[in-house]
């Protein structure tokens, strides 16, 4: 959602994406840490997938609300969502130049800066969580610590792992697109962030036990890098899998962006 008319608006928009992603990871991975790390009171709780699904849904709502309060239209908090809007917007600009009010160069500058902000926000949030929960991290095996940072597949299979993340991201983006189309029918009166909250909650319930449902490159790669850089004994960031939660969501956003721009 790019509501930028000139470069003077970029800093506030980028700052909103940074803070939105920061609070997304702080809330989402914070909840995951409560459920996974040793000596946490919630470690032995039941229905962990359900708890994680609702926690991440609320984390998305928090991130979107905070970002949008700083800059109306911000709140992508996901490089794949930002790329979808950039791809579809660029093609729409080429096909229908009279109906789009932003320049293509500004759009792609905004995209690159948004990505930097989203990854930086995710990494800073994870670094803060590691500081807060370090005593628990020290008493937890490194593979369990890894899943408090990023996603890991239950069974490593490149084609199926990639397809799972691709499909889940496609559902997310399509849901946001369809929800936005109801604006003329006053659907937009619901608080911004409610639709992605519900969609993410449902996606984690549907796909989370297989791949963890990253559907967001910043959410996965940013904290994974923090894990890699942290002084955790016998750590393994699972780099052979790390490209899938990045490439699959971005591939879905490009393909959907092209289809939407050309067909819709």
Swiss-Prot record:
Q: Which domain of life is it from?
A: Bacteria
**InterPro entries, alphabetized:** Aquaporin-like, MIP, MIP/Aquaporin, MIP_CS
Motif NPA 2: which ranges?
A: 216-218
What's the protein called, per UniProt?
Answer: Probable glycerol uptake facilitator protein
This protein's membrane topology, according to the annotation, is: Multi-pass membrane protein
Residue span of motif NPA 1: 78-80
The chemistry this enzyme catalyses reads: glycerol(in) = glycerol(out)
Gene name, per UniProt, is glpF
| Recorded domain comment | Aquaporins contain two tandem repeats each containing three membrane-spanning domains and a pore-forming loop with the signature motif Asn-Pro-Ala (NPA).
Q: Which residues form a coiled coil?
A: none
- Which keywords does this Swiss-Prot/TrEMBL entry list? Cell membrane, Membrane, Repeat, Transmembrane, Transmembrane helix, Transport
The record's GO molecular-function terms, alphabetically, read: glycerol channel activity
A Gene Ontology cellular component where this protein is annotated is: plasma membrane
Question: Membrane-crossing residues?
Answer: 13-33, 51-71, 104-124, 162-182, 195-215, 244-264
Coarse class of the primary localization is membrane
Tell me, in a sentence or two, what this protein's role is.
Mediates glycerol diffusion across the cytoplasmic membrane via a pore-type mechanism.
Similarity remark: Belongs to the MIP/aquaporin (TC 1.A.8) family.
Compartments it resides in: Cell membrane
